[in-house]
């Protein structure tokens, strides 16, 4: 399962097929999958995720011409029987101690665990909480004047748990470290202007087969935003535009709306390309 490319498809195949034939090796990532094979005469590798695999790539290069004359790779599983490196162990402990005062600072409280588990419609309680928080931070005039916020599900990396952490803050208290575990990225919030038609396009781009989207990625939404969709409908036509409402009022396809997303999405991340066209960014 770690070498080979059984069932490989999607963006990585399309990307490799567009490369110049002069490219010999593609060391890829971001998919979190493990693969190692030749695609379009190029050696393509990926080492899964979170340090579970190390890829050993072996190239033979003709010194006279600079050309690669042979190439091979092997994905090696990282096992737990390797002794810890004393230098790295000490370095990690040092920076954990430096970060502890910030990581252990209590920033809020909850009365129960809030999970990222999605329902049949693709929404999660934690995703909606994050979208609500993003909306709350940007809806005032001067701070964005947003009417809706969207959050990508892939950016939610853990549940927000009620039980206290080893830091000893106590049950129900949320620390900065716990919130960082939920969203461990350096993203900022971006509020932009979209038309109603662009919001409809954004919702269509959640679904596999619309534009460059190769998987369903249901955006988490702030309170007051509603719409209907059918998975059985054709690609790019799954959302009923007449059903898209903000606080019960249907959107106008030619009207303009202030929309908040994180900077990853604002740059077209996860193939939500219409967000690149947003104007009046703040």
Language model feature labels by segment:
Residues 1-18, 130-131, 135-140, 201:
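N-terminal short leaders/motifs
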Residues 38-42, 67-72, 124, 128-282:
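Feature captures C-terminal
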Residues 5-105, 211-221, 234, 238-241, ...:
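Active-site-adjacent helix-turn-beta-strand microarchitecture at beta-sheet edges
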Residues 7, 26, 51, 83, ...:
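Extracytoplasmic/periplasmic, Sec-exported soluble proteins
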Residues 103-123:
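Glycine-rich phosphate/diphosphate-binding loops and the adjacent beta-loop-alpha structural elements
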């Amino acid at each position: 399962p770690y070498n080979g490319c059984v069932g490989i498809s999607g963006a990585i195949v399309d990307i490799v097929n567009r490369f110049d034939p002069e490219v010999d090796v593609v060391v890829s990532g971001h998919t979190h999958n493990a693969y190692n094979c030749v695609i379009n005469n190029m050696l393509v590798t990926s080492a899964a995720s979170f340090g579970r695999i190390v890829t050993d790539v072996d190239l033979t290069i003709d010194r006279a011409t600079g050309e690669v004359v042979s190439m091979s790779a092997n994905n090696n599983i990282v096992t737990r029987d390797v002794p810890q490196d004393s230098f790295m162990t000490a370095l990690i402990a040092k920076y954990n101690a430096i970060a502890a005062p910030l990581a252990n600072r209590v920033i809020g409280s909850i009365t129960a665990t809030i999970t990222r588990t999605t329902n049949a419609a693709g929404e999660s309680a934690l995703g909606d909480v994050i979208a609500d928080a993003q909306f709350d931070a940007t809806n005032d005039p001067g701070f964005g004047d947003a009417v809706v916020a969207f959050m990508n599900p892939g950016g939610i990396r853990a549940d927000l748990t009620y039980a206290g952490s080893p830091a000893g803050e106590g049950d129900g208290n949320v620390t900065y470290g716990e919130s960082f575990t939920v969203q461990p990225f350096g993203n900022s919030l971006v509020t932009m202007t979209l038309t109603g038609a662009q919001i409809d396009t954004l919702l269509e781009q959640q679904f596999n087969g619309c534009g460059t989207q190769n998987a369903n990625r249901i955006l988490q939404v702030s309170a007051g935003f509603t719409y209907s969709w059918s998975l059985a409908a054709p690609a790019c036509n799954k959302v009923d535009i007449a059903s898209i409402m903000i606080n019960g009022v249907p959107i106008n396809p030619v009207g303009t709306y202030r929309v908040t997303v994180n900077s990853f999405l604002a740059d077209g991340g996860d193939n939500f390309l219409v967000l690149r066209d947003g104007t009046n960014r703040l």
